[in-house]
């Protein structure tokens, strides 16, 4: 679980490859962030991982999340939909927002819960992600957060970046799970309220 390209994982994976060659009846299931799996399989002695079946997990289904919130909190479809939208299908956000709403449902409005929700995302996830971004990664994400721009061409022009360079960093940010590109020529932030987190970083 949560594998990274560490020395111990490399040793273990190398040993596992030997066990496979000896036809031992063993199986290995690895889970982790896309970027960490990507870096691990690119290790020159672990190329066998390229041939291993991979399942890339998509965000949780919006309709399923909305239904859960409707059932648990006895909400109408619009109120549950508003909650579901705030998670963007991110599992940790789904859990945290559900917990906070349950704890405060009779005391606070959803708007009043958001600061604590943002704090959880910041402390447990976003600060770590932000610390691992390069300066140019941050520059791109900051421009997306402040301007709300999603058109790749417009973003490149705002950032004064050539297409080739922007493409490299777009792929980096996709591997890190920070942005998604579901439509040709467009990119959006993948994480819920990450734009709010980024805006706060500019004030620090």
Tell what function each PLM region has.
Residues 52-80:
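Conserved small helical "lid"/interfacial subdomain of P-loop NTPases
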Residues 78-92:
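A short helix-loop-helix "switch/interaction" segment in the helical subdomain of ASCE P-loop NTPases
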Residues 93-165:
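Winged-helix-like regulatory helical subdomains adjacent to P-loop NTPase cores
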Residues 185-192:
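Minor-groove-contacting beta-hairpin "wing" of winged helix-turn-helix DNA-binding domains
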């Amino acid at each position: 679980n949560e594998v990274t390209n560490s020395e111990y994982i490399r040793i273990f994976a190398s040993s596992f490859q030997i066990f496979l060659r000896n036809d031992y009846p063993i199986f290995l299931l690895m889970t982790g962030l896309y970027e960490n799996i990507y870096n691990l399989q690119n290790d020159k002695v672990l190329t066998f991982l390229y041939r291993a079946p991979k399942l890339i997990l998509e965000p949780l289904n919006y309709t399923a999340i909305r239904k859960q919130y409707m059932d648990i909190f006895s909400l109408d479809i619009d109120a549950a939909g508003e909650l579901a939208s705030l998670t963007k299908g991110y599992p940790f956000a789904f859990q945290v927002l559900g917990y906070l709403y349950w704890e405060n449902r009779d005391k606070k409005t959803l708007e009043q819960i958001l600061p604590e929700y943002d704090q959880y995302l910041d402390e447990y996830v976003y600060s770590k992600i932000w610390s691992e971004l390069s300066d140019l990664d941050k520059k791109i994400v900051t421009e997306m957060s402040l301007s709300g721009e999603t058109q790749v061409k417009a973003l490149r022009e705002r950032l004064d970046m050539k297409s080739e360079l922007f493409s490299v960093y777009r792929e980096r940010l996709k591997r890190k799970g920070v942005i998604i590109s579901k439509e040709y020529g467009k990119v959006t932030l993948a994480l819920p309220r990450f734009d709010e987190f980024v805006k706060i970083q500019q004030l620090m």
